């Protein structure tokens, strides 16, 4: 619980896409990213190594890979805009970095929604000591 409190406090001062990512997860998956995914498996949260533990952890792995492909963008602080059209999230705006970050976040939120039935509470607050070995390539 302490770790979640720390994450929540840190997010209060964040002006960039971390807050937007949380909002997208809530809109698309209908659950809190901070609560369910800030410390899940080997890839959800800070860091990431080893192999994803399940489909939800793979969503975070793919999200990390998506961010890694961005050049000249800061997914932690860059702000983006999106809108809803007929129930769908549409990333947009004049900033190409913001649009790319939004697309990464949107894909992860959709992945979380689609893998909800495989979410396993044993991977929540999973010790990174269990995530040894080489990471899977993107």
From Swiss-Prot:
Keyword list, A-Z: Disulfide bond, Neurotoxin, Presynaptic neurotoxin, Pyrrolidone carboxylic acid, Secreted, Signal, Toxin
Molecular function GO labels: calcium ion binding; calcium-dependent phospholipase A2 activity; phospholipid binding; toxin activity
Pfam families (UniProt xref): Phospholip_A2_1
Disulphide bridges: 42-131, 44-60, 59-111, 65-138, 66-104, 73-97, 91-102
Location of the protein in the cell: Secreted
Propeptide residue interval(s): 78-83, 119-124
GO cellular component: extracellular region
Entry-linked InterPro entries: PLipase_A2 (IPR001211), PLipase_A2_Asp_AS (IPR033112), PLipase_A2_dom (IPR016090), PLipase_A2_dom_sf (IPR036444), PLipase_A2_His_AS (IPR033113)
Protein known as: Acidic phospholipase A2 homolog sistruxin A
Tissue expression remark: Expressed by the venom gland.
GO terms classed as biological process: arachidonate secretion; lipid catabolic process; negative regulation of T cell proliferation; phospholipid metabolic process
Modified residues (Pyrrolidone carboxylic acid): 84
Signal peptide per UniProt: 1-37
């Amino acid at each position: 619980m302490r770790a979640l409190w720390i994450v929540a406090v840190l997010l209060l001062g964040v002006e960039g896409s971390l807050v937007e990512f949380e909002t997208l997860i809530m809109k698309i998956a209908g659950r809190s990213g901070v609560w369910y995914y800030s410390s899940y498996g080997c890839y959800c949260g800070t860091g990431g190594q080893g192999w994803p533990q399940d489909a939800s952890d793979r969503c975070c792995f793919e999200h990390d890979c998506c961010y890694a492909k961005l050049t000249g963008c800061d997914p932690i602080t860059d702000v983006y805009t999106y809108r809803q059209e007929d129930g769908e999230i549409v990333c947009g705006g004049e900033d190409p970095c913001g649009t790319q970050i939004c697309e990464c976040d949107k894909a992860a939120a959709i992945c979380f929604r689609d893998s909800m039935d495989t979410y396993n509470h044993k991977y929540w607050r999973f010790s990174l000591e269990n995530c040894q070995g080489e990471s899977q390539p993107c």
